[in-house]
């Protein structure tokens, strides 16, 4: 039956071919030949290319104007007008040959130039040498690294800790180690740049909530809960993370951790807490925002911090439950593929921890000095203080913007320069403006340390007031 049908179709096709008009057949034949030519012919013929004469080549070379490798940089760009520091940036700092009181470095506990810390680093230098020349998995693990991890875990009262050789890479590596494509991350709009890079590397679905606005965060969590109900199968394999800072670098404010913990359990999310500014600052013993609020540290899934602020060393660490930390030893990019922390810096961090444990009163001293300068800086005409009174790093922003970010930056830099002329070292907060997710307003960043005396704090506040009045009014 099928054979008869096929024969009938073939007969019909032949009959249609005979009955077709001649012009129709000619047109189809031309099209078929043209298609064959296009398939088998080259896109160009070598003989059709005419060689240029030497004179023509020279003219083309002279006319050619290459595009610049980098965009033009204005002469007043900060990268071209940097300050040169001589000696350690501790309590007093020598900038461009001028000695100033340091209100710019994150040396909160004054350990950067501490004799005990330097002695520990020197002893380690004599024992181990300068560096390790290898990552932790390839002969880069020294006993001092394990000692530091053990000390950090005990200090933070967690099961385990892991150290990284670069502070920025700590949270930027930890986030993509857990959060992957398809997962959902709820993050504060004021999150620091290291968190932003970690989120970018994770390729997760990012949802921004207003700074420290728990109502806005819950709104996003509820919306996600509704979406999960529409597709339960996908929801079962989608992980949800909340990423916040204990003390925000860009605002100087403390996160509302108790409310975050409630939302965590209510909506079944995990909390990543970045404590680079709050570690060694908040809490009775400097354990950070969990101790500040009296929160059980087991309620936080992962805590990270760098050791470049309070500990006055280099690198960073993560701490938490053992199974959480062990995962990073194979998945943390900054841990697996970077040379391990130089032993001398690990030894310095251990000695800094010893000092913190031996002198818990140092944290109360720091808080009191923070309150003093916050109070002294209130009421500056043209400037407003941004940050909480407990924060040793806060911002001075213009009360009213000029409408131009460039002009705002110039005004604030003029204040910084005139303060330096009066031996008060400040700095503007700098950002990669084109890469920031939510670019903060221009500001002067002020840093308080335990080494600054009450008289120096008052002097700095009065100097800033006088200079601001002269520049802004």
Swiss-Prot record:
It holds the Pfam family Aminotran_1_2. PANTHER family: CLASS II AMINOTRANSFERASE/8-AMINO-7-OXONONANOATE SYNTHASE (PTHR13693), SERINE PALMITOYLTRANSFERASE 1 (PTHR13693:SF2). The chain crosses the membrane at residues 16-36. GO terms for biological process: ceramide biosynthetic process; regulation of fat cell apoptotic process; sphingolipid metabolic process; sphingosine biosynthetic process. Pathway: Lipid metabolism; sphingolipid metabolism. The lineage of its organism: Eukaryota, Metazoa, Chordata, Craniata, Vertebrata. Residues 1-66 are annotated as: Interaction with SPTLC2. The transmembrane domain is involved in the interaction with ORMDL3. This is Serine palmitoyltransferase 1. Keywords: Acyltransferase, Endoplasmic reticulum, Lipid metabolism, Membrane, Phosphoprotein, Pyridoxal phosphate, Sphingolipid metabolism, Transferase, Transmembrane, Transmembrane helix. Its EC number is 2.3.1.50.
